[in-house]
Amino acid sequence: NIILAAVKAEGTTVIRNAAKEPEIVDLQNFLVRMGAKVQGAGESTVVVEGVKQLYGVEYDPLKDRIEAGTFLIAAATCGGEIETKGVFSENIAALLHKLRENGCKIHTKNDKIILWSDGRLKSVDLVRLCN
């Protein structure tokens, strides 16, 4: 939200300890296509130079990686095969690693992920790390 406000604010806004999620990078890409001056999305510092006007563009935003992960986990748990499109494997690499540890077979190519599971998952250790 700060990036969105800063785009139309006068002067330069520096955001420190910024979120680094892929969606933030995608937001920067979208805003830049509209004429905004945003640098550093995906890094800890984002610099936004306010502009007077933004322009309409056509843009295909990132697909929801949380939603894709939910469907992958459901298929892993219930057994069967699922294919997701529009989510890049590097954006959910930790989840895919754990699903493989669970015993799922996973194939990735570009923005396509195919998961197969017999529904008999192995237990794995999960640890949440904070940045």
What are the functions of these language-model segments?
Residues 1-131:
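Short, structured segments at the rim of ligand-binding sites
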